[in-house]
Swiss-Prot record:
HAMAP family: Ribosomal_uS11 (MF_01310). GO terms for cellular component: ribonucleoprotein complex; ribosome. Part of the 30S ribosomal subunit. Interacts with proteins S7 and S18. Binds to IF-3. Belongs to the universal ribosomal protein uS11 family. Pfam families: Ribosomal_S11 (PF00411). Located on the platform of the 30S subunit, it bridges several disparate RNA helices of the 16S rRNA. Forms part of the Shine-Dalgarno cleft in the 70S ribosome. This is Small ribosomal subunit protein uS11. Keywords: Ribonucleoprotein, Ribosomal protein, RNA-binding, rRNA-binding. Signal peptide: none annotated. PROSITE patterns: RIBOSOMAL_S11. Gene3D superfamilies: Ribosomal protein S11. GO terms for molecular function: rRNA binding; structural constituent of ribosome. The keyword RNA-binding applies.
Amino acid sequence: MARPKRVGKKKEKKSIPVGVAHIQATFNNTIITFTDTRGNTVSWASAGQSGFKGSRKSTPFAAQIAADQAARRAQENGMRTVGIFVKGPGSGRESAMRAINAAGFKVAFIRDITPIPHNGCRPPKRRRV
């Protein structure tokens, strides 16, 4: 016997005019997350989720497409002004910032929060190609 469907309130759209865009650009992928000022996720996208696989995920074009998708979803929730936090050494940093700017957001600030070790863990060995 099929379960009866639960009838409840529909999820109401929250209007979040000011938010923060977090861009995490690694060597293999780029992840863009839009949050409100308290850090609750509003929308996100990544190069892999946008349909890119393998080494194409690490390209600037993939980061641009992912940033555009995340920005569009954030704008549906009423976001108009963003601050941008950039983390990581990846190649998608600049293009993701440009895509967010081109999506029509008013950019309040851009801050680089890449963690820099004070001689912490040993880095991976150099590649020999």
